[in-house]
From Swiss-Prot:
Top-level taxon in the UniProt lineage: Bacteria
A Gene Ontology molecular function term of the record: quinone binding
GO biological process, one term: pyrroloquinoline quinone biosynthetic process
NCBIfam families: PQQ_PqqD, PRK02079.1
Originating organism: Stutzerimonas stutzeri (strain A1501)
Gene designation: pqqD
Subunit structure: Monomer. Interacts with PqqE.
InterPro entries, per database record: PQQD, PqqD_bac, PqqD_sf
Protein name as catalogued: PqqA binding protein
Family to which the UniProt record says this protein belongs: Belongs to the PqqD family.
Length: 92
């Protein structure tokens, strides 16, 4: 897989829906075959994915929201790489 660029725009793949699930008391990613429960960090990143904003814009917003988090850009990019590998999101 190629390295994620800050200029790329992530979006959820067809069939995937991100939402808060009260019964699980967490954000989840729903897809036809099931559901993925997300931790707070994953939910914070995926909340920013809207199909219009770049990876760089998402990183900047999360850096502003969590200024004490060192290495946040690397963590966000690494998570997005996993999300692409698992076919949750796609990049354009």
């Amino acid at each position: 897989m190629s390295e994620i660029q800050l200029t790329q725009v992530p979006s959820f793949r067809r069939g995937f829906r991100f939402q808060w699930e009260p019964a699980q008391n967490c954000h989840v990613l729903l897809y036809p075959e099931g559901m993925i429960k997300l931790n707070e960090s994953a939910a914070a990143v995926l909340t920013e994915v809207d199909g219009t904003r770049t990876v760089g814009a998402i990183v900047a917003d999360l850096q502003a929201r969590y200024p004490e988090a060192e290495g946040i850009q690397e963590d966000i990019v690494a998570f997005l790489e996993v999300a692409v590998e698992r076919f949750w999101i796609e990049l354009r």
